[in-house]
Amino acid sequence: MLLNTLSPAAGSKHAPKRLGRGVGSGLGKTGGRGHKGQKSRSGGKVRPGFEGGQMPLKQRLPKFGFTSRKSFVSAEVRLSELAKVTGDVVDLNALKAANLVTKNIEFAKIVLSGEISKAVTVKGLRVTKGAKAAIEAAGGKIEE
């Protein structure tokens, strides 16, 4: 089978109605656009959210909150993902080497999700209470 020989099954596709080709077609003269107005013209569109000059909903509602810039350089790592780290010391560079966090990450936190079987030493990372208990139960330790 060649891609350039593929075609739809016979009768499965209908040709679209051609606009502006006589009154008898049902789509002659104005071609389904109605009479006059911005939307009848070529290129006649209004931008998304435009409400005809009325104050748009987006501007009627109050602003709220903000996005912390620290969230762009912070990441969470699941406990089960620590198995992908080679070696027994887990720090930020080890997480980057194992492709668990991207290169722009500066802060990481280990959270309790899944299980850990090997003993690891966690250095310079924040750890949740549950994850800390699980790491220590597996024979590992946490260093600041």
From Swiss-Prot:
Residues 32-44 have a biased composition (Basic residues). Residues 1-57 are annotated as: Disordered. The keyword Membrane does not apply. The keyword Ribosomal protein applies. Keywords: Ribonucleoprotein, Ribosomal protein, RNA-binding, rRNA-binding. GO terms for cellular component: cytosolic large ribosomal subunit. Gene3D superfamilies: 3.100.10.10. GO terms for molecular function: rRNA binding; structural constituent of ribosome. Signal peptide: none annotated. PROSITE patterns: RIBOSOMAL_L15. Coiled coil: none annotated. InterPro entries: Ribosomal_uL15 (IPR030878), Ribosomal_uL15/eL18 (IPR021131), Ribosomal_uL15/eL18_sf (IPR036227), Ribosomal_uL15_bac-type (IPR005749), Ribosomal_uL15_CS (IPR001196). Residues 21-31 have a biased composition (Gly residues). Pfam families: Ribosomal_L27A. GO terms for biological process: translation. Belongs to the universal ribosomal protein uL15 family. Binds to the 23S rRNA. Part of the 50S ribosomal subunit. This is Large ribosomal subunit protein uL15. It comes from Vibrio cholerae serotype O1 (strain ATCC 39541 / Classical Ogawa 395 / O395). The gene is rplO.
